[in-house]
């Protein structure tokens, strides 16, 4: 008789934990699954929860059904957030794939977002290297390497100097 009540309390604890995680920020479905399956930190150190795969599936399904968990919304917010921090489309795509988002969902969200990647790349280069962007070859290579590291595409980087009067 104690078995059903302990299962229910396990489900309730897992659901409570999921809601607390999602209250902080949006997560992808894969991120939420990973965090729910991970041990909980307590005063005595990491404490493993007795979570069954069925309970985990029920909690994730409940979160999706009640719109606490939405990968499409997460992708849009993630793209906006990372682009505001100065990252380019290649890096954002790579980070989203690490978070378990399907490639077609990422590509659709990238098409839907209204971001001018060339002007963002120019802003990042000007912030790092100053107002007239360098025109010497060695300095251009440094700027290019920096922007590639930040995740901008080569054609966006080349567009900066194409429209730049020396």
Swiss-Prot record:
Chief site of localization: cytoplasm
Subcellular location: Cytoplasm
Pfam families: RecX_HTH1, RecX_HTH2, RecX_HTH3
UniProt keyword Cytoplasm, yes or no: yes
Highest taxon, organism lineage: Bacteria
Any GO BP annotation: regulation of DNA repair
Listed InterPro entries: RecX_HTH_1st, RecX_HTH_2nd, RecX_HTH_3rd, Regulatory_RecX, WH-like_DNA-bd_sf
Entry keywords, A to Z: Cytoplasm
Any one Gene Ontology cellular component term annotated for this protein: cytoplasm
UniProt keyword Cell inner membrane, yes or no: no
General function of this protein: Modulates RecA activity.
Annotated family: Belongs to the RecX family.
Protein name listed in UniProt: Regulatory protein RecX
Gene name per UniProt: recX
């Amino acid at each position: 008789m104690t078995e059903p009540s302990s299962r229910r309390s396990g489900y309730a604890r897992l659901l409570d934990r999921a809601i607390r995680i999602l209250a902080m920020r949006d997560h992808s479905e894969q991120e939420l699954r990973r965090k729910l399956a991970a041990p909980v930190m307590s005063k005595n150190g990491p404490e493993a929860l007795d979570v069954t795969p069925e309970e985990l599936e029920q909690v994730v399904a409940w979160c999706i059904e009640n719109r606490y968990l939405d990968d499409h919304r997460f992708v849009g917010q993630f793209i906006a957030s990372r682009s505001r921090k100065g990252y380019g489309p290649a890096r954002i795509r790579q980070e989203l794939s690490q978070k378990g988002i399907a490639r077609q969902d990422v590509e659709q969200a990238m098409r839907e977002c209204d971001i001018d990647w060339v002007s963002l790349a120019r802003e990042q280069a000007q912030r790092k290297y100053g107002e007239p962007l360098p025109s010497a070859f060695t300095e251009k290579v440094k700027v290019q390497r920096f922007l590639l590291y930040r995740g901008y595409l080569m054609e966006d980087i080349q567009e900066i100097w194409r429209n730049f009067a020396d």
